[in-house]
Amino acid sequence: MDSSNASLNTAEAYCAKLHLSDAARADLLAKAARSADPLVEVHHLLAGEGFDTENPALSSIAPRLKMALDGAERHGEQLESRAFTEDLQGRVRLATMPTLRRASFTSRPWSPNPLKALFRSIGRLLLGGGSQRPEEGSAAVPEPDAPMPAGRWHVAASVRRFILVFLVIAQTVVATYYMTAVLPYHGAHALEVAMLILYAVLFAWVSAGFWTAMMGFLQLLIGQDRYSINSSKVPDSKLPGGARTAILMPICNENTARVFAGLRATYDSVMRSGQGAAFDFYILSDTSDPDIRVAELEAWLLLCREVGGFGRVHYRRRRHRIKRKSGNIADFCRRWGSAYKYMVILDADSVMSGACLVRLAQLMEANPSAGIIQTAPRASGRDTLYARIQQFATRVYGPLFTAGLHFWQLGESHYWGHNAIIRVAPFLAHCSLPRLPGRGALSGEILSHDFVEAALMRRAGWAVWIAYDLDGSYEEMPPNLLDELKRDRRWCQGNLMNFRLFMTSGLHPAHRAVFMTGVMAYLSAPLWFTSLVLSTALLAVQTFAVPQYFTQPNQ
């Protein structure tokens, strides 16, 4: 008697977890109570004709999933075809990802030694500029395959950069001349020579930032930019059927509630735009914490139930975390990338409006030679004092520098790795990143992959733009100084690694300059410190030197 009561209690506890009305649950328990094993009978009643005596629980998976997902029916979803699939053993499971569309995304190793590359370039010039044969094992320079590799903007970009170089050099020469005049030995002492060299380098770095901000200010003041990618004449019409876009959110051990809240806001905004059929969403998880993995899957299931997102909002977790974020995106490209014309990369803290996403896809359609269009995300969403100071600062000077970068770079701009749209086909063809050979901190997986991907995209003839005047793109700042330092350390290492690729064959000078500015962003600090040390040493020399009042005998 006690055994039968225990079995019935187990069945009652089990039914309490099922997504049933009270009346349906009571009816199911009443029928199951007449059996010798109530729990097995519950599975029998749920499975119906598909009941398997050897695997009672397994045979009732499909009806239990349907009961759990009945909220999706309110959204008009075809539950059978979109929410469920079968594995190779014929078992019913949730369709977290679409059918595979495999594509090749491979790369050949490169030789990233800048000195060797420099010597090879000098050798080619001395020998008459023969054909550029790649070193054994290195990646060959691809032929440009974009519709308009140069673009009508290319002449304007060349003229603007010539002006920038002239302004920086002229300003640096004048400043160095006056600096020489105020030094005690007027540049005749060895310490002063070293100081002047550092001064010229650092002043040129500051001058480049000054002219970038100045031109950004003038650009925003005038308000008209004929070369802005956002000024393209694009009809605000429905996207064509072939312009399917995948919105990717790579995550790794993130705050699950925050991630899915941001994704929900983006999804709802896209649906309100009336262009939702052109977009699919992918949560690409590299999470290693088992508790967070469970929370992510539950959050995905809840999101799909609430918005009817089965078949449109997908979730994939990698078991083997290879090459971090770039490897996460590469895995998507190999498995499903060929099914889409474009993809938008989001960070875990990113939010983008539907109008912004639709506009990006329309700009891609209107500019067939554009490979990447990067938005200028606004910092928002944090409430700590440190983050609010950072948000205020980026709101003040961020638009100036972004507009200035666009003015000088045009279609050879930065890509920051998120809040940007990418043309999938050339990305698959040209932007796979091999590991950097060697040992140590500056080898292995490329950390600042975004700069390298932009350089490779432009090397193949595709333009990289910054849509600095496009609204609707947001990101969050680190909430405290420790998180800021962790991120900055990663960026510092990544930019120093990228300098190994500075002399890679075929890269455009504009992107070589991007690599150099990335290095200077962190190298300038020790250079300033060295300048202070030299100035202190010069002061000591001048202080302790014995003055010579008489330069000739018997004076």
Task: Name every feature range the model reports, one short phrase each.
Residues 1-19:
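A short, charge-rich alpha-helical start-of-domain segment used by transcription regulators
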Residues 8, 21-36:
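Conserved RNAP core-binding helix
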Residues 37-63:
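Short, charged early-sequence alpha-helical segments and their helix-coil boundaries
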Residues 58, 62-145, 269:
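Membrane-anchoring/interfacial helices and their immediately flanking loops
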Residues 125-169, 184-193, 222, 226-234, ...:
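Basic/Trp-rich segment in TM-proximal cytosolic loops or flexible interdomain/linker regions
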Residues 152-259:
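N-proximal low-complexity "stem/linker" segments adjacent to membrane-targeting elements
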Residues 211-214, 218-507:
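Internal catalytic domains of large membrane-associated glycosyltransferases
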